[in-house]
Amino acid sequence: MRLRWKFLFHFFGQMLIVILLLTVMLVASFFYLDARFSDAESNSGLTKATTDTLEAYLDVNEDGTWEVDNFLKKSVDKQHGWMQIIDSEGNTDYSYGVPKDVPGTYTKKELLSIYKTKKLHNYKLNYWAINIEDKSYLLLSGWKSKSEQLLTSVEKREQKIDSLAHYKSSTIDYIKRKKGAIYLLDSNGKILDSINSTKSERKTMNQLELLKYSSKPWNYKREISVKILNKDRWMVATVPNPVYVTDQEFNKSFLKVVLKAMFLVMAVLFMYIIWMTVWYMFRFGLPIFHTIRWLVNLSKGKLEEPRNREGRPVSKNKKGKIKQPYRFFGEIFESMDQLTETLRRDKRNREKIQATREEWIAGLSHDLKTPLSSIYGYSMMLESKQYDWSPEEVKEMGQVVREKSEYMSKLIEDLNLTYRLKNDALPIERKLTSLIPFFKNVIEDFKKNPFSEGYDISFVSKEEHIEFALDEAWFRRILENLLGNAVKHNGKGTEIQVILEQTKNHISLKVKDNGKGMDEETITHLFNRYYRGTNTKDSTAGTGLGLAIAKELVHLHNGTIHVNSRTNIGTVITILFKKQ
């Protein structure tokens, strides 16, 4: 997989994980807050419930049975109460915790009484008109009010209920045991008398507070029940409120829950960020830092991967394989390995080229200096008035000067040719040629050259006819240079064979001799310009550029050239062309 696709899938996966994590955390937080909110609401029973809240917790199955959420049941239990769902006919469709004295069917008169008094027998009631599955129902929530029970007990114990000063001591003890209080109020809400009351409660005991209590009973520490004795007298009973949770306390409690949930979310996110930071440091930081160190090494000429204390490349294990943290960038490290090896190879090649260039310049300087010395010496002799040269001597010196000049001219021409070949600036005109007569003609012309005397040069081919498209002038130069090299570096009596062969797809030309041969170093540099040099004193004088020129001309004909040689056995130079 290409690196950019790796990055794409990797970061897509990371973003997906982050989104999933945030989604899970938000959903979990929502459920946590909902559960805590429900718990807080259930503490006040169903007194805070709204129609929408109740409808959300109720459902009717296809068989007509009711699904009631535990939240509602828990809220009813908190008040030690009961719950009924009444249909439009007044019949009970669902009930929970209903006592035996609560009817299962209600008349219109009873329902009207419930609407007015919010009471049923000894029970206080809350009611809601709800709509489930497009059907209307009445939900009743009833509970035995301890303050109402206190009033009922006092009525039973005392004949004159409005004469608090004459209550029996047993009645007063009963009121105190129930942690209750009894108040007698006039029509203006003024306290006329009280039993077991407190100063703070007396301050808030008025008609306005009684009305407020009826709308939000959970905001009051004391549960209140009122009995109208006559138009001028009210009796009020109070006991500890079992569903006392003020709106302010509820909001504070819920805020704490929200803050706690936010803290948990932030803590999880913080831990995730720390984990991702460490993970990214090992996943991306180490490989990137290692790559930078590697590039710094290369820039300083240290052509190797950074190593650990054991001397092993940092990204590799003992088996030479890429370590786990570095595998994601495997392609980059492979490229870095290739780059490092290429730089090493280029450095070695530069060093070899530098050495070859120095040798080439030294040899070329030598071969230019030698003929120049001869020319300079003879010119000085001819210029001198000290000697009187005969015509024969002048002719002999002129011949030497001409030969040395021709050699230098040939050397310059060969240098120019090699650079033209290197820069693809040499024109070539290839035409289909019959190779056997062409090679025989070139060999015969070469054998006529005086410096080829004493060498057994022959042409061998088992084929009768072979054709190939070539430039005759430049191909003649190839063969002459190869033959000249064989003659130049081997003694007289050496057998030199030019062998022409063909296969189904290729044509091969071999120049084979049984001469001195070459060592490996000479073979390696054989086609470098002026590697072996030359000397104008040799009878087989040349420029030292013959094989370099031959190689470039072979490449110009889309061929390849190879050398096989063994010291004291001989040399075979093979040229291979692909048939067109």
Curated annotation (Swiss-Prot):
Its EC number is 2.7.13.3. InterPro entries: 2-comp_sensor_kinase, HATPase_C_sf, His_kinase_dom, HisK_dim/P_dom, HisK_dim/P_sf, Sig_transdc_His_kin-like_C. The modification Phosphohistidine is found at H366. It is found in: Cell membrane. Residues 28-261 are extracellular. GO terms for cellular component: plasma membrane. Keywords: ATP-binding, Cell membrane, Kinase, Membrane, Nucleotide-binding, Phosphoprotein, Transferase, Transmembrane, Transmembrane helix, Two-component regulatory system. It comes from the Bacteria. GO terms for biological process: phosphorelay signal transduction system. Pfam families: HATPase_c, HisKA. Residues 1-6, 283-580 are cytoplasmic. Its main location: membrane. GO terms for molecular function: ATP binding; histidine phosphotransfer kinase activity; phosphorelay sensor kinase activity. It catalyses: ATP + protein L-histidine = ADP + protein N-phospho-L-histidine. The chain crosses the membrane at residues 7-27, 262-282. It is an enzyme of class 2 (transferase). Residues 363-580 form the Histidine kinase domain. It is a multi-pass membrane protein. PROSITE patterns: HIS_KIN (PS50109). Member of the two-component regulatory system YvrG/YvrH that positively regulates 7 transcriptional units (wprA, wapA-yxxG, dltABCDE, sunA, sunT-bdbA-yolJ-bdbB, sigO-rsoA, and sigX-rsiX), and negatively regulates the lytABC operon. Probably activates YvrH by phosphorylation. PANTHER family: PHOSPHATE REGULON SENSOR PROTEIN PHOR. This is Sensor histidine kinase YvrG. It comes from Bacillus subtilis (strain 168).
